[in-house]
Design a protein with these regions (language model features):
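Intrinsic structural disorder/low-complexity segments
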Residues: 11-12, 90
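Bacterial N-terminal signal peptides
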Residues: 14-24
Length: 331
């Protein structure tokens, strides 16, 4: 094969954003809904400020579009290590105006001292469903709250208790709810901790979005020893629905706890069935503020907005800042 033909094939590969996966039967092509990720800003779009509730860190945001604006709920941390959720909104997705006070602060015993962490958002009808981690400095547990305006929240409590799972015998965190029913049920990918102290991804289902049951006896997306996701496999934002399946952005950490971003595709009719998984990360720490902060070498994607021609992803940098990444839609 000539060098010219090889270059042409590589160009077509890059343009179509097609990933080839070798199987025992044949090569199956999976098409991702987006192209190459590019930082929308080389600097943080949200940073810690003041001496109070958001003075140590503002990071790991969830986002939705409401009344023509991008609304962000972000994790804010004070110098004592207590987390709350702040509210900010934007017309362009980059420049945000914050509310002066948090919209969700620790109240229950399961949130005391540690706080409310790492939000994810999904909307059904006129109700917003917020999954978050309740942390009381001893236990981290996956919790739920609902709202009609993203400001006033009704807590539903712990939805997946720690230490009581099928395979996840430790903490539970990071609930990414699929934005449509499948087989008459709601589905949610989550993080659980196995007896060997590794964090892996599980799946749960619900009839009402409040009461959840684990769907499997083993992780649906396990860690991979020796790779970039050898230690942590954690859901990102709400999955993207495509003809290929459920496209799930996830955050993986290696044995040195360097966090990078990757992609998995699950069957749209059977969300337990993994179809594709990144061999390499699609996004990694590069900027100084992604490498130096409260936790070094972290990019952690939790928010996503579909802007029509592209996607805008939001992430935490080094557990201190918020950044944004643009990715064109695949054609």
């Amino acid at each position: 094969m000539s060098d010219r033909n090889t270059a042409q094939q590589r160009s077509l590969f890059a343009t179509a954003f097609v990933i080839l996966i070798s199987t025992s039967v044949a090569a199956v092509a999976w098409k991702l809904p987006f192209g190459t990720w590019h930082r929308a800003s080389e600097t943080p779009i949200l940073s810690p400020q003041g001496n109070g509730w958001e003075s140590a860190g503002t990071f790991n945001p969830a986002v939705v579009v409401r009344e023509g604006k991008i609304v962000m709920l972000y994790r804010a941390q004070d110098t004592q290590g207590t987390s709350r959720l702040g509210y900010a909104e934007s017309t362009d997705g980059i420049h945000f105006t914050r509310r002066p006070e948090p919209v969700l602060s620790p109240e229950g015993d399961y949130e005391k001292d540690g706080g409310v962490e790492d939000p994810r958002l999904v909307q059904f009808g006129d109700t917003y469903y917020l999954t978050y981690t309740g942390y009381n400095t001893k236990d981290a547990q996956l919790c739920l709250a609902t709202s009609h305006d993203l400001i006033h929240w009704d807590r539903k409590g712990v939805i997946l208790p720690a230490y009581k799972g099928n395979w996840n015998t430790g903490w539970t965190k990071s609930g990414a709810i699929v934005p449509e029913k499948i087989d008459g049920r709601y589905w949610m990918y989550f993080l659980g901790t196995t007896p060997d102290k590794n964090d892996q991804m599980g799946l749960a289902y619900s009839a009402d979005l409040v009461h959840w049951t684990e769907a499997t006896k083993t992780p649906v997306l396990p860690r991979r020893p020796g790779q970039f996701d050898s230690r942590v496999v954690e859901p990102g934002p709400t999955p993207i629905l495509t003809s290929e399946g459920l496209v799930l952005i996830y955050n993986g950490a290696d044995d040195k706890l360097v966090y990078r971003t990757a992609v998995a595709i699950f069957d749209r009719k059977d969300p337990t069935k993994l179809l594709y998984r990144s061999e390499q990360p699609i996004f990694a720490p590069q900027q100084e503020w992604e490498k130096v902060g409260q936790v070094p070498n972290v990019v952690f994607v939790e928010g996503m907005v579909d802007r029509g021609n592209d996607y805008l992803f939001y992430y935490g940098g080094a557990d201190k800042y918020v950044g944004a990444v643009e990715a064109p839609k695949a054609r």
